[in-house]
Each structure stands twice: as structure tokens, then as C-alpha cells.
């Protein structure tokens, strides 16, 4: 997914100080951000002009101590055609020489009131998520009690219908049919809908419905962490399904593994309620409460007491 300079302006902390529509269309190709401290001294041997250049109090103070001529020369070297944007933190004053260099090299300038370190973290996090490689999977992504649950299964098993029932029960739809997933870091998956399918659900026999229009803004969510996967499959008497919850299965997406639960589907089962319980049970395990272990402890204790009685 490409990110353009104009996309940064959607962040409430940034305002445009220099640059026309053409400059705002420049692509940002890396999430790395440069703090051009050494460059201010004239050392450009390992300069990376393709990065966003972020100027904070230290860089600005050094720059302002220079003569107007030297300041202009340094900024001309720092502003390159491949530089996507220069950002000024702490709402610092923008010297005339910087505007002149930006005009000559055609580089946009943005400014923010935020501190340099906080601004750097926010922009890096935003770019990491936008520039991360996406993996598309078939399924329905729901936010259930704050847990991101990916519902998968064979075509026609009832994934979208289950998603609709969960929406009616107060949960939120993130994506239906195609879920775009990316690794936010080494252990965290994040999912979002394809833009053309945002807020939409396809129900066989009914067609496409707009969940936001029918159920309101509280029924949808633009993105969510993916914490657990649920796989729906037809009930088979010849197949053994996990009854205690101690059989661990995992789904790997984008190099990150998450737990996956297989749920048999047959007439009379309320699948949406089962998925709710699965989400709450997973959260309980994350908080250190494992019903399976408690059952095993009770069973072991009962067996021990029975053995004592027989002795």
C-alpha cells in the first residue's frame, strides 16, 4: 500500500506550511525517519534523502546559529528531489532559507506542535502499518468484546450470517469476505477490509447489506487486531472434536501465529453464542484463568480422594 505526503495531513498534529498539490502527491517509500543532525554540520556521506526529514529543537537551534548563506547552502544539500517531505516539530519558526530551499528543490514542508520524539513515534507507527505487506485471507473479521476474531470456513458454511448475528448481538464488523492482514510487529497481526467492501456484508438470498446504514456507526470498525481464529466446519460423527480445550492449533499469517479453534456446525447450534464464548474464554486464559486446568485439578483431586477412601 502506497502512502503519499497528503496522507500525513490526515494526522491531526500536522499542518501544511509549504507545497502545492503536486508535492503533496509525492510517495513515502520507507517508514524510517531521519533526524539530520550531522547533516547540519555539512557531513552528508551517509545521508538518506529518501526518508522523511524531521527537524526538532536540537537541529533547529544549530541551524539558526548559522549565517544566512551557510544555512541556505546546508538546506539546499538536505532538500533533494527524492526527499518526500520535511517536518518541523514543536511549532518552531521556519526560516526563509528553508522555504527558498524547499521551493528550489520542490519539497513540501509540514509542521506540528508535538514534541519531536512523540511525533517521530506517531509517524513511524502510522507508516509501519500503512507500508506493511498485506496478506488477503477469506473470512469475516469481527470485534467481539474488544477481541479481534477471524471467522473462517468453507464457502457456504454461514460465516457472513454468523457475522450478522454477532452484529445484532452488539459486536462490530471489521471485514467480510476478504480480510487484509498485516504484521504490525513480530507478534501482532492487524486486519482491515478491502476498501470496496468496507462496512458491507454479503448474505445469500438477501444480497449485499450496508451494516453501518442498517445498524449504525457503533456496529462497524475500520480495523482491528487479529487475536484468535475460529474455523467453522460441517459436523462429522466420524471426526473427533476438542471437548476439553487442551488441543492447541495455530494459524500462521504473515509469519505470525495465532490460536485457532475448530467449531463443528450442525442444525440447532447457535454458532454466534459459541464464538462469543470462545472469545471470552481466550481472554480469560490471557488473564491467567484456564477452565481446562481447573477441571483437570478438580478431577485429579476427586480421583485422589476416591483412592484414599478405598484404601
Curated annotation (Swiss-Prot):
What CDD domains does this protein map onto? Answer: HprK_C
Q: Give the Gene3D superfamilies listed for this entry.
A: HprK N-terminal domain-like, P-loop containing nucleotide triphosphate hydrolases
Q: Which UniProt keywords apply?
A: ATP-binding, Carbohydrate metabolism, Kinase, Magnesium, Metal-binding, Multifunctional enzyme, Nucleotide-binding, Serine/threonine-protein kinase, Transferase
The reaction(s) catalysed by this protein are: [HPr protein]-L-serine + ATP = [HPr protein]-O-phospho-L-serine + ADP + H(+); [HPr protein]-O-phospho-L-serine + phosphate + H(+) = [HPr protein]-L-serine + diphosphate
Q: Sorted alphabetically, which InterPro entries does this protein's record hold? A: HPr(Ser)_kin/Pase, Hpr_kin/Pase_C, Hpr_kin/Pase_Hpr_N, P-loop_NTPase, Ser_kin/Pase_Hpr-like_N_sf
The UniProt record gives the binding positions of ATP as 153-160
Q: Where is this region: Important for the catalytic mechanism of dephosphorylation?
A: 264-269
Q: What class of enzyme is it?
A: transferase
Query: Where does the chain bind Mg(2+)?
Result: 160, 202
**Names of required cofactors:** Mg(2+)
- Give the multimer and partner information: Homohexamer.
Name used for this protein in its record: HPr kinase/phosphorylase
Organism listed in the record: Streptococcus sanguinis (strain SK36)
| Gene transcribed to yield this protein | hprK
